[in-house]
Amino acid sequence: MVFVTIIIIINISYNIYNIYTINENRFTFNAFLQSKKASFTFICIYVCISGGNMPLWAYILFRTFLHPSSSSNSVLCFRRHNQDYHNRIFFAFCCHHIWSLLPHHLSIFPIRRQFYLNSRQ
């Protein structure tokens, strides 16, 4: 948990620095939210809040659906996806929570499956 917190702090600092330099030495929170690098920050925060209990497919879903213009590294090129950006974050969160509510997903992870079987006895 401490390691994840350190990664979050480093990542947010790095993102702020990047956006500060891209926007001619001005930092705006809106530009941070629209940057591609912000997605990793959201992933780190979510993993930290959920105690690290996030399946790998949810991470892949985040990386796939969050970046419609994956070849672009510019914040300015990402502005046209502003509305989609929040919808895709919401979609990824919903998919993960629906998946975590299903009991059959425990059979995919052997440790969690054993814990699930022991708790039912």
Swiss-Prot record:
Main location class: membrane
Spans through the membrane: 2-22, 42-62, 89-109
Membrane-topology descriptor: Multi-pass membrane protein
Entry keyword set: Membrane, Transmembrane, Transmembrane helix
GO cellular component: membrane
Further facts: Partially overlaps PRM6.
Name this polypeptide is given: Putative uncharacterized membrane protein YML047W-A
Organism: Saccharomyces cerevisiae (strain ATCC 204508 / S288c)
